[in-house]
């Protein structure tokens, strides 16, 4: 699944090329062909059922292309593609998804939820303008609260967008557990970087087993 962000194209073929621009045209064509056959899927306002360790979870892909803050990003495109004309309509779409979800839920989003702090160094706090405040998505925060009100367990919220290193040089937390929900900000920039002995790619790994759920940061070498 690919959750497109605010800097991504809206077309899967272009996004596949964007993700693989350093790998050559053959790689790009292969990714594009796989996307057409279903192995790569753009997600957003979509419900994906996952079975792991004998339990069923609902992976709910929230609003794509979000830039955070109090307004709906790319309103014309969101209306044309998803039928979403406002944050209130987005909220209602997420509510319907929660109603159809299993008892255990993982939210996947581009930007994280509002409510986790309004300082520049907070998980989704605004660091690019004075007094920016909380830059999380209010519709996502509402959906999380609604899921809890329906006695559903929000196991994790996985997002990014707000770079872990702020413009002030502060490091945001990449993981927080609040009210039994694990919040993950995976926006390490650059995600692909040169190390002393290799080129590394930053990932966040989620493991689910009979004892519960764990997260870890993984640096995968390109050549080693």
Label every model-predicted segment:
Residues 1-53, 172-176:
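Core catalytic region of metal-dependent phosphoesterases/phosphodiesterases
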Residues 56-71, 106-110, 181-189, 216-220:
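Active-site-proximal beta-strand elements of phosphoester/diester hydrolases
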Residues 103-153:
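Active-site-proximal segments of metal-dependent phosphoesterases and phosphodiesterases across multiple
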Residues 50-53, 146-153, 162-224:
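Binuclear metal-dependent phosphoesterase catalytic core
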Residues 52-104, 136:
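Binuclear metal-dependent hydrolase catalytic cores centered on His/Asp/Glu-rich metal-binding motifs
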């Amino acid at each position: 699944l690919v959750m497109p962000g605010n800097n991504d194209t809206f077309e899967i073929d272009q996004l596949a090329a964007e993700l693989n621009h350093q790998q050559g045209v053959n790689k790009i064509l292969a990714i594009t062909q796989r996307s057409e056959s279903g192995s790569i899927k753009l997600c957003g306002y979509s419900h994906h059922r996952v079975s792991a360790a004998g339990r069923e979870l609902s992976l709910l892909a929230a609003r794509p292309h979000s830039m955070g803050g109090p307004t709906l990003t790319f309103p014309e495109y969101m209306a044309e593609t998803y039928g979403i004309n406002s944050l209130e309509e987005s909220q209602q779409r997420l509510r319907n998804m929660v109603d159809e979800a299993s008892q255990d839920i993982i939210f996947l989003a581009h930007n994280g939820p509002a409510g986790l702090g309004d300082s520049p160094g907070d998980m989704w706090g605004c660091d690019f303008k004075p007094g920016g405040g909380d830059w999380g998505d209010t519709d996502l925060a509402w959906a999380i609260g609604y899921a809890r009100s329906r006695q559903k367990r929000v196991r994790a919220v996985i997002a990014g967008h707000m770079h872990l290193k702020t413009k002030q040089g502060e490091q945001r937390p990449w993981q927080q557990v609040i009210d039994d929900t694990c919040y993950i900000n995976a926006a390490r920039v650059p995600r692909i970087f040169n190390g002393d002995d290799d080129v590394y790619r930053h990932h966040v790994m989620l493991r689910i087993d009979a004892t519960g759920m764990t997260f870890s940061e993984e640096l995968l070498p390109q050549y080693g």
